[in-house]
């Protein structure tokens, strides 16, 4: 009898889990647009460049706690993020041109 009760307990637990999963599925999911994602990525690139510029200014002014290796790392991060942004732009332009050249 205890095995049956154990199985019934597991079944009721699975049913409760399924009910909560259905309840979560019915909640409206936030939608993020492509333009919103692109704008957020551009903001992150801008923030990275601003942080690198600020670090470089602090190092140039001789503020304590700002090491050259940190400045160089931040500058490289900014450079890589900018190059990534340029490559994404190039791919988007190429995709747009390909779509526009398609025959309807």
Curated annotation (Swiss-Prot):
It is found in: Bacterial flagellum basal body. InterPro entries: FliE. Pfam families: FliE (PF02049). One of its GO terms (cellular component) is bacterial-type flagellum basal body. Keywords: Bacterial flagellum. Its main location: other. This is Flagellar hook-basal body complex protein FliE. Belongs to the FliE family. GO terms for molecular function: cytoskeletal motor activity; structural molecule activity. One of its GO terms (biological process) is bacterial-type flagellum-dependent cell motility. It comes from Escherichia coli O139:H28 (strain E24377A / ETEC).
């Amino acid at each position: 009898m205890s095995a049956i009760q154990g199985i019934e307990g597991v079944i009721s637990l699975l049913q409760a889990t399924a009910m909560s999963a259905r309840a979560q599925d019915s909640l409206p999911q936030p939608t993020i647009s492509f333009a919103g994602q692109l704008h957020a990525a551009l903001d992150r690139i801008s923030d990275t460049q601003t942080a690198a510029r600020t670090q470089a200014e602090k190092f140039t002014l001789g503020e304590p706690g700002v090491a050259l290796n940190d400045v160089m790392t931040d500058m490289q991060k900014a450079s890589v993020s900018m190059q990534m942004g340029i490559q994404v732009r190039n791919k988007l332009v190429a995709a747009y041109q390909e779509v526009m050249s398609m025959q309807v």
